[in-house]
Amino acid sequence: MKIIANRMQVNVGQEAEYKRRHDEIWPELSQLLKEHGIHEYRIFLDEETCALFAILMVENPDRLIDLPSNPIMQKWWAYMKDIMPSNSDFSPVSTELKEVFYLP
């Protein structure tokens, strides 16, 4: 099992909408993520800066390689692009975070 952490951003004033959309996550997207070996996925919001911190546990990171080309994933990204910085393929602008501490 590998833990992956990322930093993203939600546009100022769109925090509640971001949460609402995730509270209503599409069942097909949830299923897709699980099928790709994701067991836990949490996103935290820093309300002062609108920074998002995502943490996910995945069986094997190699299983995530084809996720960006999946039509469900692409549709979700297109749905989210109006409330967060996005790349040209509509994926969220994201920076992988380096683990610097772990308490077993």
PLM features: what roles do these ranges have?
Residues I4-Q9:
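Active-site-flanking beta-strand signature of metal-NTP-handling nucleotidyl enzymes
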Residues M1-I3, T49:
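A general secondary-structure signal for short beta-strands and their flanking turns/coil
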Residues A16-Y18, F53, L64-D66:
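Short acidic, gly/pro-rich beta-turn/loop elements at beta-sheet edges
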Residues Q14-H39:
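Short amphipathic alpha-helical segments
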Residues N11-Q14, P61:
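A short, flexible beta-alpha/helix-coil linker loop
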Residues H36-H39, M57-T95:
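An amphipathic, aromatic/His-enriched active-site/gating alpha helix that lines ligand/cofactor pockets
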Residues V10-V12, P27-Q31, P85-L97, Y102-P104:
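Charge-dense, helix-prone N-terminal extensions
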Residues S30-F53, M57-E59:
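Short, glycine- and small/hydrophobic-rich beta-strand elements in well-ordered beta-sheets
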